[in-house]
Amino acid sequence: MSQALTLARPYARAAFAIACEKGKCMQWSQALTFSAQVANNPIAAALLCHPQIDHEQAAALLSPEGADPAYVRFLEVIAEAHRLDVLLQVAGLYEKLRAEAEHVIKAKITSAIELAPNELNNIVTALKKRFDCEIEVTTGVDHSLIGGAVIDTGNVVIDGSIKSKLTRLQASLTH
């Protein structure tokens, strides 16, 4: 996985630089998401690896309808370098670069029960204050947490679950 990220990083940076230069960051984001999904389809992946498919045809197959010509050329470069297998990682890294540039942090909030809208708003407000940027939230429910919540922003994990508190208490009692 880390090798795929290492290979994908320069492509993601190049895509982000080109998209920003053209003022089309969101369009490229959507196009990369589409292309990564197509490339990850086993049938499409087999077709893309076929020796009779050249890099221009591969780029055409992966491009969404009406894609920016520079985006299509970007896909041609990746196909020519035989790196279509890291397109999913390119898309993920591109999204991170876009979020950083837009001062947005993506947070995953997992709680023992579904959070009420006002509870979720309170958490988002606290996260905005702590990180001084906008927060995009996805939520999930994990009953094994017993109570509380776990907030994962990618770089920071805030674990306020009862499960982790009980685990820490157990560890302190056994040592």
Curated annotation (Swiss-Prot):
Leader peptide range in chain numbering: none
UniProt keyword terms in alphabetical order: ATP synthesis, Cell inner membrane, Cell membrane, CF(1), Hydrogen ion transport, Ion transport, Membrane, Transport
SUPFAM superfamilies: N-terminal domain of the delta subunit of the F1F0-ATP synthase
One GO location term (cellular component): plasma membrane
UniProt xrefs under InterPro entries: ATP_synth_OSCP/delta_N_sf, ATPase_OSCP/dsu
Keyword Transport listed: yes
Membrane topology classification: Peripheral membrane protein
MF term (GO), any: proton-transporting ATP synthase activity, rotational mechanism
Pfam families: OSCP
Localization per Swiss-Prot or TrEMBL: Cell inner membrane
Entry superkingdom: Bacteria
Predominant place of localization: membrane
Subunit structure: F-type ATPases have 2 components, F(1) - the catalytic core - and F(0) - the membrane proton channel. F(1) has five subunits: alpha(3), beta(3), gamma(1), delta(1), epsilon(1). F(0) has three main subunits: a(1), b(2) and c(10-14). The alpha and beta chains form an alternating ring which encloses part of the gamma chain. F(1) is attached to F(0) by a central stalk formed by the gamma and epsilon chains, while a peripheral stalk is formed by the delta and b chains.
UniProt family annotation: Belongs to the ATPase delta chain family.
Stated role: F(1)F(0) ATP synthase produces ATP from ADP in the presence of a proton or sodium gradient. F-type ATPases consist of two structural domains, F(1) containing the extramembraneous catalytic core and F(0) containing the membrane proton channel, linked together by a central stalk and a peripheral stalk. During catalysis, ATP synthesis in the catalytic domain of F(1) is coupled via a rotary mechanism of the central stalk subunits to proton translocation.
NCBIfam families in UniProt: ATP_synt_delta (TIGR01145), PRK05758.2-2 (NF004402)
Annotated protein name in UniProt: ATP synthase subunit delta
Lineage per the UniProt record: Bacteria, Pseudomonadati, Pseudomonadota, Gammaproteobacteria, Lysobacterales
